[in-house]
Regions:
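Conserved ABC transporter NBD signature motif
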Residues: 1-10, 14-15
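ABC-family P-loop ATPase nucleotide-binding domains
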Residues: 14-17, 23-80
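Conserved N-terminal glycine/acidic-rich loop preference
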Residues: 20, 63, 71, 77-78, ...
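N-terminal cationic-hydrophobic initiation segments that often serve targeting/anchoring roles
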Residues: 42-45, 83, 117-118, 136
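A short, proline-enriched helix->beta-strand linker immediately N-terminal to the Walker B motif
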Residues: 85-90
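Catalytic Walker B motif of ABC-type/P-loop ATPase nucleotide-binding domains
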Residues: 92-96, 101
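Helix N-cap at the start of a conserved alpha-helix in ABC-type nucleotide-binding domains
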Residues: 103-105
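ABC transporter nucleotide-binding domain
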Residues: 110, 114-126, 130-190
């Protein structure tokens, strides 16, 4: 695996400036507020865009003076994403970035990612998500991984055009041509 054309162990400080990362449980001390984080980001990233960061905080209703320890799970998730987007990274690595967000916040965040990619066509996003609809409008390729193995790799357009999820009762399932079924999941309800 290479990152920005290099082996990970070869990345230098300047290369790492080009990475934006969100992890589900990582970040700043919870005793800091967003204004404190802005001061840190200005020192960490030479390309930190404070104006855009503040604007995004405002759009996602992230208070600047409140300590992170008093943030909800969703507010913390939004802040992690805004930090990743704050310094014009060439590669975003996002682990479940919309987990814990309500539908409105999730859609706003996805719009920000789409906007980010439109303004930076030479950038890439590596994103993990259990919410497949989050991926449809963002990704060119989708990899499905199960137990550490790639079980499906397909262009997003092909995936949307040629694959589907069917929810049927047992009688309808028995009538289906099983040749085209990749996976089944029996549920106890509905």
């Amino acid at each position: 695996i290479t990152v920005l054309g290099k082996m990970p162990c070869e990345l230098n400080g300047k290369d790492k400036q080009k990475l934006g990362v969100t992890l589900s449980e990582a970040g700043f001390s919870t005793y800091l507020n967003v204004k404190d984080i802005i001061r840190i980001l200005k020192k960490l990233y030479y390309d930190f865009d404070e104006g855009e960061f503040r604007s995004r905080c405002d759009r996602l209703r992230i208070p600047l003076d409140k300590n992170i320890k008093d943030f909800s799970t969703g507010m913390r998730a939004k802040l992690r994403m805004l930090v990743a987007l704050s310094h014009n990274a060439k590669l975003l690595i996002l682990d479940e970035p919309t987990a814990g967000l309500d539908v409105d916040a999730r859609n706003r965040l996805l719009d920000m990612l789409r906007d980010y990619m439109e303004k930076r066509p030479d950038s890439s996003i590596l994103i993990t998500s259990h919410i497949s609809t989050d991926l449809e409008g963002l990704c060119d390729d989708i990899y499905m991984i199960h137990d550490g193995n790639v079980v499906l790799h397909e262009d997003t357009d092909v995936l949307l055009d040629k694959y589907a999820v069917l929810k049927v009762d047992e009688a309808a399932y028995e009538k289906l041509d099983k040749t085209y079924i990749l996976k089944t999941n029996k549920e106890s309800f509905g």
